[in-house]
Amino acid sequence: MHGKKVAIFGVFTALALIFSYVELLIPINFGIPGAKLGLANLMTVLVLYKMGTKEALALSVTRIILSGFMFGNLFGILYSLAGGLLSFLVMVLLKRSDWLSVVGVSIGGGTAHNIGQLLVAMVVVQTYQVGYYLPVLLVAGEVTGLLIGLVAKEVLKRIQGISLL
């Protein structure tokens, strides 16, 4: 990466970490263990659309590892990596298909994130019974993906003429 690109990547990483921390401070209880709004994923969506696939992957992994060490634990990193990587893969594929807006891509990512975490939970606790959470997690992923997608759509509209590269 060149100087400007590194600086912009650093800003997005810092914002993602700030959003991760802010999310810890928001006392929202969805009644689902580990469920969060996914505010930091807003930065991943923005980087995917403004900087590219490699940069978005680097941001996602960097944010997950750093926020895991700063605010969580090793299991949290494991769950977040599973969800984050599956979410990233789904968002890249949906974005490349060109038939969904950023909102649809974000909904797909939010849903995939929860599925990835559920799959890891099944392996960790060695039972498929945690799969009973799937319907609730799918709805939660759709709702949070929708919210993040709507914010991303608005931000992208406002920074449309700004070159980040």
What are these regions (language model features)?
Residues 1-46:
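Hydrophobic transmembrane alpha-helices
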Residues 39-53, 90-95:
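Generic transmembrane alpha-helix motif of multi-pass integral membrane proteins
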Residues 43, 66, 70, 116-119:
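Transmembrane-helix signature of multi-pass solute transporters
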Residues 12-19, 48, 59, 63, ...:
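Alpha-helical transmembrane segments in multi-pass membrane proteins
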Residues 6-11, 42, 46, 54-61, ...:
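Hydrophobic alpha-helical transmembrane segments
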Residues 20-37, 62-91, 102, 124-129, ...:
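Interfacial aromatic-anchored transmembrane helix boundaries in multi-pass membrane proteins
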Residues 73, 77-78, 97-165:
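Membrane-embedded alpha-helical hairpins and interfacial helices in multi-pass inner-membrane proteins
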